[in-house]
Amino acid sequence: MGWWLFPILGYFIGSIPFSYLIPKWLKGIDVRKVGSGNVGATNAIRTTGPVVGGICLLLDALKGFFPVFIATTFSGDPKLVSLTAIATVLGHDFPIFMKFKGGKGVASTLGIIFCLSWPTGIVFTLTWLVIVMLTKYASLGSLVALYISALLGYLFKGYDTGMLILILAVLSTLRHSENIQRLLNGTERKVNLFKR
């Protein structure tokens, strides 16, 4: 199997827009036209509720997990695994099936983190939950959890894993630029995890 097939597979799997498809199929809601308009799990949770949004979150995480799992299983080369992970998140962020307008990569990155270091994935999840429950700001929870995960990935698994998660954190930060501005202005949208 050619090395280049792994990142290509990752990109196309990452491009599957579960956070658009699931709300559309189950609730008839186009997430591009409601809430923040973002094709991601947070907007799905905000606009369709915790059940449908939770399904989107799980599927978006799994599409991050599996390409990296495949690359790790059949290659194991850290550089190829990293390239596959980055390609997968870029697929989520810029999906070919949605005219390159996608999400912000958090759920897919979470799946990648669980694949590389499940203890780090658990810490990410708990950090995100605590911050979002306290502040109602999913973007804040995501960014804090990502950078904590980069440090833990380095401590638990070494330089390659820590650096990969850091790169993915930076990519997500760039995708969250408008959210960061709204957080600073006090106008960021809030999300309630337990009700629509």
Swiss-Prot record:
Subunit (UniProt): Probably interacts with PlsX.
Pathway in which this enzyme or protein is active: Lipid metabolism; phospholipid metabolism
Gene Ontology terms for molecular function: acyl-phosphate glycerol-3-phosphate acyltransferase activity
Source organism (scientific name): Thermotoga petrophila (strain ATCC BAA-488 / DSM 13995 / JCM 10881 / RKU-1)
Lineage: Bacteria, Thermotogati, Thermotogota, Thermotogae, Thermotogales
Disulfide bridge partners, by residue number: none
Keyword set includes Membrane: yes
General function of this protein: Catalyzes the transfer of an acyl group from acyl-phosphate (acyl-PO(4)) to glycerol-3-phosphate (G3P) to form lysophosphatidic acid (LPA). This enzyme utilizes acyl-phosphate as fatty acyl donor, but not acyl-CoA or acyl-ACP.
Major location category of this protein: membrane
Family, per entry: Belongs to the PlsY family.
Gene behind this protein: plsY
The protein's name in its UniProt record: Glycerol-3-phosphate acyltransferase
Subcellular location: Cell inner membrane
PANTHER family named among the record's database cross-references: GLYCEROL-3-PHOSPHATE ACYLTRANSFERASE-RELATED, INNER MEMBRANE PROTEIN YGIH
Transmembrane segments: 2-22, 51-71, 80-100, 112-132, 137-156
EC number assigned by the record: 2.3.1.275
One of the GO BP terms on file: phospholipid biosynthetic process
Superkingdom of source: Bacteria
Topology in the lipid bilayer: Multi-pass membrane protein
SMART domains associated with the record: G3P_acyltransf
GO cellular component: plasma membrane
Entry keywords, A to Z: Cell inner membrane, Cell membrane, Lipid biosynthesis, Lipid metabolism, Membrane, Phospholipid biosynthesis, Phospholipid metabolism, Transferase, Transmembrane, Transmembrane helix
Pfam families: G3P_acyltransf (PF02660)
Catalytic activity field: an acyl phosphate + sn-glycerol 3-phosphate = a 1-acyl-sn-glycero-3-phosphate + phosphate
